[in-house]
Amino acid sequence: MEVTKLDELCIQTIRFLAIDGVQKANSGHPGMPMGMAPAAYVLWTRLMKHNPANPRWVNRDRFVLSAGHASMLLYSMLHLTGYDMALDDLKNFRQWKSKTPGHPEYDPQLGIEVTTGPLGQGLGNAVGMAIAEKYLASQFNREGFPIVDYKIFVFAGDGCMQEGVTSEASSLAGHLGLDNLIVVYDDNHITIDGKTELSFTEDTARRYKAYGWNVIVIDGDGNDIAAIEKAIQKAKRYKGKPTIIKLRTHIAYGSPNKQDTADAHGSPLGTDEIKLIKQNYGWDGEKTFYVPDEVKEYMLRTKDAGQKAQKKWDRLFKKYSQAHPQLAEQFNVAASGKLGINLDEILPKFKAPGAMATRKASGTVLNALMPRCPLVLGGSADLTPSNNTRFEGAKDFQKDCPEGRYIRFGVREHGMGTILNGINVSGLLRAYGATFLVFSDYMKASIRMASLSKYPSIFIFTHDSIGVGEDGPTHQPIGHFAALRSIPNLLVFRPADANETAQAWKFILENRNGPAAILLTRQDVEIIDQEKYGKAENVSKGAYVVVKADNPDCLLLATGSEVSVAMKACEKLAAEGIRAQVVSMPCWELFEKQDKSYIDSVLPPQVTARVGIEAGVELGWHKWIGSKGIFIGMSSFGASAPAKVCFEKFGITPDKAVEAAKKLLNK
């Protein structure tokens, strides 16, 4: 394929928009956009199936800029190809409430598929997107009707390659043979510190071959668009393996003084350098944010091509609807974001008396729900028997079984988190992943990205306290409740018993407005009698009265397994003539959203004698118990001993709660 002057002009325009945006903001990363402009041009205008007129088209190819610092490259492409990204938006780069923040933030209506920036997150998301496409294709495609057949394209950099999460996600992608995933690796040999040889000398091509990937290497300077197009076309046709294209590029390509230097990575090039670059290409060095008319006209043809592609798909789907009406209806329901079932009809109800670990209750709930929820996937980071996450009759999602709904993530917690986020942004699927709560630390970045972006990801964390017992302090979470609650937009559920667990699942599945974490016990907890005490349905309000007291003397507030501690303490206090009201607080975030009248009905403001009980650190509790309240919990790491002994030795007992209440009441 011959490179035309118009091709060159388009590529130059992409480069110059990117560096002008960074320069105007006096902040940003100009180097990678300059080096990767040819690859972006070829992919977006010739190879990627997308419709700028309808960015949410369900069968579009997905583009993920895993190296999110190169955001001006993405924004420039969105503008030039006709998305809702005006030239003024590029001029507003990195400014307050602009469409163009420093790193891309999830906005599918703008064409931004995922939030990226922390390196490696995007590549992990892309693996999840590829899993979603494979599963959806297995469910809905029929002979002659490939209604789901999109690809996932990723631009990743040297930093992405160094992050551990990239190794986790890439390893699993190779194992699963995700041949719908294509990564273009910007091999520019530069990081913030300097040349990559300072710390990164491995053979990435051989590494990815070992992962089970198809590897294509393009040497040179990153400007051979014919070679790039050929490589991507080959990758699109390749079967059985994901593909990585190792593209040798030069950071800040065309900059006389800063090409191939670390200075070009994360700082503006400077007005003088930009003038030199533009003049060397025959441009007016004084003009900024300039798009030649012929470039504008040519690149906007992408929009026309996208509309034609979608119209072709629409015609196919119309025929599909006639040939397979039931499947088409299911597809449309899924695309609307609805479950399509009444959860109240199938949720299990648990009778008292009895006891059950909430992780086992969660497993029972999944066994009831999953046969009726074919668009929910799940898995575990190699803790399936402990997490109770594999439902009866489940098939594993594997290379030769894309219809499987259970994902074996392996010991890859961080990778699991990023992959879950990728599945959950598909728009049609929900996905959960599980590990021990103490290992949520390994995946914190992915939980944070889900919360920032409001992905409806579901994180199951079992073994949630010193109730872990004999495994000891290495596996007993202490500060994790507080750490998760500190993340904005994350709903943290810690149910008190089996029925609260079922109601937590109901709320999570019915709400797609953001992520949720559900924290579950290893040890058995008593089932609260629904006929005698407060109803578990009130989990949807975040907190509720379990044991009601008229004109209470004190309040006992608790979460999870400690609600039963509070209830036993209440009985002991009643025997001494002290009226205690017990409050279960399974989700603080939901409780905070209730109106004042409801909050005051649960926590009467006139009752200041309050005891908080939770097998974690005190942080955050004084919002509920007040400055004079007493907290019963953990102030140190745990210990290796049976769970019952741990609770006794650390003083999380009914007797200690009684003692605290009496102290507050001066009795």
Give residue ranges: language-model regions.
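N-terminal capping segment at the start of a domain
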Residues: 11-27, 185-188
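Cofactor-binding active-site loop characterized by glycine-rich and histidine/acidic residues
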Residues: 36-176, 390-391, 419, 423, ...
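Thiamine diphosphate
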Residues: 95-107, 125, 131, 135-139, ...
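A short glycine/serine-rich beta->alpha loop
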Residues: 4, 21-30, 58-66, 109-120, ...
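Non-catalytic terminal/interface segments that mediate subunit docking, oligomerization
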Residues: 315-456, 534-545, 549-552, 557-560, ...
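Glycine-rich phosphate/pyrophosphate-binding loops
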Residues: 51-52, 133-143, 425-442, 457, ...
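Terminal amphipathic helices with adjacent charged low-complexity linkers/tails
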Residues: 58-59, 243-340
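A short, small-residue-rich loop immediately preceding and capping a beta-strand
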Residues: 25, 61-62, 112-115, 143-163, ...
